[in-house]
C-alpha cells in the first residue's frame, strides 16, 4: 500500500512555532549575555551582598562592593546620594507601585534592583510570590533568584564598568543626552503616565535597544533631568562601587524604650500572648516612633523567631494573620531603613501614657483566655473567632483611640490603589463611631460569638480564591447577619434613646471621633475633622464594621493574590459600606430614610437598596431627635458638629487657619475669596485634577498652601464596573483645604494674591480641555517647566514644615501632563 503523508494538525504546528520562537529568544538572550561578559566581565550576583546581624542592625558591605581603582573619596550615600535620590527619584520610586518595583529610598532597594513582574495585577489567575523589600529576601543575590535584575554594576569592578554597566547611570545619562522640551505638554503618543500603563523594564541586555527605541524615556521619567553637578555626584558614587554607611546608632533612651516595649509585647501568659497578637495584626503597617524622641526614629512592629536581646529574624508570611511556622513568636521593633513616603506613613507614638492605656484596656478586666486560638485560616481570618476571649469593648476601645490610624490601614495600605479598588466609596464622606458605652450595637460578646460564622471574611479562602463562589456565599451570610442584627437592634435599643448620645464624642478629648475620607479616583486620604462641604453620605461605624474593614482590607488582604481574592475583597466592601450607611439612617425620621437611601443609590437595583435600608436591613424605631426643619440630614450633621465641637480637629478648617495665620490676618477679603472658590459646583470642576496644590503668593510673608480636592458626583457606587456611566458632573463639588491633602500631587498652581478671583473665574468657566490648557498655561507648573525641581523642592519643604518636619515625601508619579 502506498503510504500517505498527512499534514500535521494545526495544534502541532502551533507548538512547533512556539518552541522555535522560544529557542530563538533563548539563543538571543544567550548571545546578549555573552556580549555583556565580553564587555563588562562575568556577572557576580554576590558583589553587593552585605553582612547585617539583623534587619534593624547596620549593614557592613563586603569589600568587593566598594572596590575601585579611583583614589578620590567616595560621596557619602546617606549625606550626599540619598538626599538627591529622595527629591529626584523616590518621589516616583518609593511606594508599593514603584515602576519596575525599583525602590530607591534605601541602599538595600538600590542593591535589590528591578523586576519585570508587577505588584498590582488585577488579572492574575494565580497568586505570586511576595517581593517585599526587607522582608521576602535580604541579600541582592537572593533577589536575583526572585527574578530581580541589578541596576548597579555586578560585573568586573572599575570606574568605567561601574558607570556604563549600571542601569541607574544609563537611565540618568539617557535623559542628559535627550532632555525634555522646556514648555507645553509632552506628546501623549510618547509619554503615558497612567497608573495602569504597560511597564517597560529593560535589564542590561536590553538597555541598548531601549535607548534607541525610547530616547525620551530617560530618568526622571517625564520630568526635567538632574543637573550636571548632581549627575557627576551619582557617577562618582557609582565609580567608587556604590558604597554606603551604617545608620547612626540609636540613643540610650530609645534603646531603653525598645526594651520596655518588647518586654511588654513578650509577656508569657496566654492573655499577654493573645493581646500581643491582636496588637501586631492591627499595627504591622504603622510607622512607630517614641514620643520623646526628638528625631522620631521610625520602627515597624514585626514577628521574629528570636527573643529580645538577640538579632531580629523576621517571620515573613503573606499576611500578618498567617501561621508563623515557629513555636513561639516574639513581637519586636525593627528599625525602618528606607525613606518615609506620605503614601505609606502611618505614625503611631509610643510612650508611658500609651503603655498605661493598653494595660487599662486589655488587662483591667478578669482574664478569660483559657487557650490560644490556632492559625488555621478559618480562625485567623475571622477576628470574632480568633479574639473572642478578649472583650469586644476592649478591642473596640483600642481601635477608637487611634481611629484615623485604623482607617489609614485601608487608605494607605497596599489595597488602596487604582480605580477598581476605590470605586466602592464616595469621593467625600464623614465618619463617626458608635459610642462604646451607650450604644450596644456590635459590642455584646454573646451576639458576636453567635454571629461569628456569618461574619466570615474573604481571607478565609486564601490568596488563590475562586471568583464567583465566595461572593455568593458571603451574600448569603450577610443576609442572615443583617436579619439577626435588625432583631438585635429592636431588642437592645428599646429602652435607649436613638439620639446623639449613641455617637462617640471622643470621651471629650479625642479628635479621632470625627473623620473625613476623600477618594481621589485611584488613591484616597483620611484626616481628622469635618472637612469640605456637607457630604452626600455619612458613615457611622460600630465595632463589627470597623473590625471587618481592617481584616478585610488590611490584615487579610494580599496584594500578591489572584483576581478572585482581589475581586471578592472589593465586593465584600460593598456590604460594609452599606451597613455603615444603615447605621447613620437610623438617626433620621423614618419617613426620610428611604428617600435619602434612594438618593444615594440612584439607578442601583432594588435588591441593593434593600441591603442599605429595607427588608434586608431594617430598623422601625423612630428617632428621638426632635427635628425642626425639612432637612434632617443637614440638621443632624449640624447638631452633631456642635456636640463634637470641643474635640473636632481644626487643622483643615479654612476659617480657623486663616484666622490664626500671621501672614493672612491683615487680608480681610482672602477668606471670602477662597470661600467663593469652594462654593463652585458642577461640570466645570470635572476638568480639574483629583487633587491640586494651590500656592498663593501673599503680599508679605510666606506663601499660603492649600489643596483643591475635586469631589466627583455619582449616582451610586454600588457596582465595580462602568463607573463613568454613573458620574454626575452637575453634582461635582470642590473642597478648598488649607495645607496638604493626599499623597499624590496631581498639579501645582501658583497664583499671586491679586489674581485669586481671576483664578476662581477661570475654574468656573472651564468647559473644555482647551480651556483647562489656558488655565494651566497661566497658573500651573508643568512637567516641562525648566525650573520644575525648584518648585517641587519648595513644595516638599512646605509640606515638611506643615508637619513639624516629620513627614513622608509627596509622590509625583501621578503629576498631570495637560
Regions found by a protein language model. Give the residues of each.
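Hydrophobic h-region of N-terminal signal peptides that target proteins for export
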Residues: 22-30
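Aromatic- and Gly/Pro-enriched helix-to-coil junctions and flexible linker segments
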Residues: 30-818
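Acidic/proline-rich low-complexity IDRs
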Residues: 18-22, 35
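Bacterial N-terminal signal peptides that target proteins for export
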Residues: 4-19
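Short regulatory "switch" loops immediately downstream of catalytic or recognition motifs
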Residues: 1-3, 176
Amino acid at each position: 500500500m502506498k503510504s500517505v503523508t498527512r499534514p500535521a494538525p494545526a495544534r502541532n504546528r502551533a507548538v512547533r512555532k512556539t518552541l522555535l520562537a522560544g529557542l530563538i529568544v533563548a539563543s538571543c538572550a544567550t548571545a546578549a549575555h555573552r556580549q555583556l561578559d565580553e564587555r563588562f566581565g562575568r556577572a557576580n550576583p554576590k558583589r553587593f551582598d552585605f553582612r547585617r546581624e539583623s534587619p534593624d542592625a547596620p549593614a557592613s558591605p563586603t569589600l568587593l562592593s566598594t572596590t575601585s581603582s579611583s583614589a578620590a573619596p567616595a560621596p557619602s550615600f546617606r549625606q550626599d546620594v540619598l538626599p538627591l535620590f529622595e527629591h529626584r527619584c523616590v518621589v516616583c520610586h518609593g511606594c508599593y507601585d514603584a515602576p519596575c518595583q525599583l525602590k530607591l529610598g534605601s541602599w538595600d532597594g538600590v542593591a535589590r534592583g528591578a523586576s519585570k513582574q508587577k505588584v498590582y495585577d488585577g488579572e492574575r489567575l494565580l497568586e505570586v510570590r511576595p517581593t517585599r523589600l526587607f522582608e521576602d529576601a535580604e541579600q541582592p543575590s537572593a533577589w536575583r533568584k526572585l527574578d530581580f535584575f541589578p541596576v548597579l554594576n555586578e560585573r568586573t569592578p572599575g570606574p568605567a564598568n561601574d558607570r556604563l554597566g549600571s542601569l541607574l547611570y544609563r537611565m540618568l545619562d539617557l535623559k542628559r543626552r535627550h532632555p525634555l522640551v522646556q514648555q507645553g505638554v509632552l506628546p501623549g503618543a510618547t509619554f503615558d503616565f497612567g497608573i495602569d500603563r504597560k511597564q517597560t523594564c529593560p535589564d542590561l541586555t536590553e538597555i541598548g535597544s531601549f535607548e534607541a527605541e525610547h530616547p525620551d524615556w530617560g530618568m526622571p521619567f517625564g520630568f526635567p533631568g538632574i543637573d550636571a553637578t548632581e549627575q557627576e555626584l551619582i557617577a562618582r558614587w557609582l565609580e567608587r562601587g556604590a558604597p554606603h554607611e551604617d545608620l547612626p546608632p540609636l540613643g540610650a533612651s530609645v534603646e531603653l524604650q525598645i526594651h520596655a516595649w518588647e518586654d511588654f509585647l513578650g509577656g508569657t501568659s496566654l492573655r499577654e500572648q493573645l493581646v500581643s497578637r491582636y496588637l501586631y495584626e492591627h499595627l504591622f503597617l504603622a510607622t512607630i516612633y517614641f514620643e520623646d524622641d526628638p528625631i522620631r526614629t521610625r520602627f515597624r512592629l514585626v514577628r521574629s523567631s528570636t527573643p529580645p536581646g538577640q538579632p531580629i529574624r523576621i517571620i515573613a508570611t503573606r499576611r500578618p494573620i498567617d501561621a508563623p511556622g515557629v513555636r513561639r513568636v516574639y513581637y519586636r521593633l525593627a528599625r525602618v531603613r528606607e525613606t518615609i513616603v506620605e503614601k505609606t506613613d502611618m505614625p503611631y507614638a509610643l510612650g508611658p501614657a500609651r503603655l498605661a492605656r493598653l494595660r487599662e484596656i486589655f488587662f483591667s478586666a478578669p482574664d478569660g483566655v483559657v487557650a490560644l486560638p490556632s492559625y488555621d485560616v478559618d480562625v485567623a481570618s475571622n477576628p470574632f473567632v480568633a479574639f473572642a476571649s478578649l472583650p469586644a469593648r476592649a478591642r473596640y476601645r483600642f481601635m477608637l483611640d487611634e481611629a484615623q490610624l485604623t482607617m489609614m490601614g485601608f487608605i494607605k495600605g497596599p489595597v488602596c490603589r487604582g480605580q477598581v479598588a476605590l470605586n466602592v466609596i464616595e469621593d467625600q464622606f464623614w465618619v463617626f463611631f458608635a459610642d462604646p458605652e451607650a450604644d450596644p450595637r456590635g459590642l455584646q460578646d454573646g451576639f458576636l460569638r453567635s454571629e461569628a460564622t456569618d461574619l466570615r471574611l474573604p481571607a478565609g479562602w486564601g490568596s488563590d480564591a475562586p471568583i464567583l463562589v465566595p461572593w455568593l456565599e458571603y451574600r448569603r451570610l450577610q443576609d442572615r447577619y443583617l436579619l439577626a442584627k435588625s432583631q438585635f437592634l429592636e431588642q437592645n435599643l428599646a429602652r435607649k434613646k436613638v439620639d446623639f448620645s449613641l455617637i462617640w464624642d471622643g470621651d471629650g478629648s479625642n479628635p479621632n471621633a470625627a473623620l473625613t475620607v476623600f477618594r481621589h479616583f485611584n488613591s484616597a486620604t483620611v484626616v481628622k475633622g469635618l472637612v469640605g462641604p456637607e457630604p452626600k453620605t455619612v458613615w457611622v461605624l460600630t465595632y463589627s464594621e470597623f473590625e471587618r474593614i481592617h481584616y478585610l482590607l488590611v490584615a487579610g488582604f494580599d496584594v500578591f493574590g489572584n483576581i478572585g481574592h482581589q475581586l471578592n475583597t472589593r465586593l465584600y466592601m460593598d456590604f460594609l459600606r452599606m451597613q455603615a450607611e444603615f447605621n447613620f439612617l437610623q438617626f433620621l425620621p423614618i419617613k426620610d430614610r428611604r428617600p435619602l437611601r434612594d438618593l444615594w443609590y440612584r439607578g442601583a437595583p432594588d435588591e441593593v437598596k434593600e441591603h442599605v435600608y429595607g427588608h434586608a436591613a431594617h430598623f422601625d424605631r423612630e428617632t428621638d431627635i426632635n427635628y425642626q426643619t425639612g432637612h434632617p440630614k443637614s440638621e443632624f450633621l449640624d447638631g452633631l458638629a456642635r456636640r463634637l465641637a470641643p474635640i473636632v480637629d481644626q487643622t483643615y478648617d479654612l476659617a480657623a487657619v486663616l484666622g490664626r495665620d500671621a501672614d493672612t490676618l491683615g487680608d480681610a477679603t482672602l477668606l471670602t475669596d477662597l470661600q467663593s472658590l469652594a462654593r463652585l459646583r458642577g461640570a466645570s470642576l470635572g476638568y480639574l485634577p483629583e487633587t491640586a496644590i494651590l500656592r498663593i503668593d501673599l503680599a508679605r510673608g510666606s506663601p499660603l498652601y492649600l489643596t483643591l480636592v475635586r469631589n466627583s458626583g455619582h449616582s451610586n457606587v454600588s457596582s465595580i464596573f462602568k463607573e463613568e456611566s454613573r458620574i454626575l458632573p452637575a453634582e461635582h463639588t470642590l473642597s478648598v483645604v488649607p495645607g496638604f491633602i493626599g499623597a499624590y500631587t496631581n498639579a501645582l498652581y501658583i497664583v499671586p494674591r491679586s489674581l485669586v478671583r481671576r483664578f476662581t473665574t477661570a475654574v468656573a468657566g472651564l468647559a473644555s480641555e482647551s480651556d483647562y490648557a489656558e488655565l494651566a498655561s497661566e497658573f500651573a507648573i508643568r512637567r516641562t517647566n525648566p525650573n520644575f525641581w525648584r518648585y517641587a523642592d519648595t513644595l516638599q519643604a512646605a509640606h515638611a514644615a506643615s508637619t513639624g518636619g516629620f513627614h513622608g515625601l509627596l509622590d509625583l508619579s501621578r503629576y498631570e501632563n495637560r
